[in-house]
């Protein structure tokens, strides 16, 4: 058991320390509850806000090349994002997150999945 902290009262040093049931315990407990409630709601409200995205079926603007929903590389020419795919046309079936296939595709062997 750890030693009790020293407590100075009226100029004399004692080893008893403060009681667990002191009067200041009540407001400390109430402030602790209020802080927990505040932190809870601040995490719900204070998250990072991402900008709203326009649905894909609405035209306007030029779509940049990237990945479609299946992880394939897509082109981005034309209004509304339609255009030919600019990805490799060698039978690649890599998906985003499949690190084994990505590393095999980038290896010096030149093989990029089944052909």
Swiss-Prot record:
Keywords, A to Z?
Membrane, Selenocysteine, Transmembrane, Transmembrane helix
GO cellular component, as recorded: endoplasmic reticulum membrane; Golgi apparatus
Localization, per the record, is: Membrane
Q: Where is the composition biased (Polar residues)?
A: 104-115
Q: Classify the protein's membrane topology as the record does.
A: Single-pass membrane protein
User: Where is the sequence biased in composition, kind Gly residues?
Assistant: 58-84
Q: Decide whether keyword Ribonucleoprotein is in the record.
A: no
Choose any GO biological process term that the UniProt entry carries and state it. Answer: calcium ion transport
One Pfam family linked to the record: SelK_SelG
Q: Where is this region: Disordered?
A: 48-115
Q: Where are the transmembrane segments?
A: 29-49
Plastid found in the keyword field: no
Q: Which family does it belong to?
A: Belongs to the selenoprotein K family.
What protein does this entry describe?
Answer: Selenoprotein K homolog
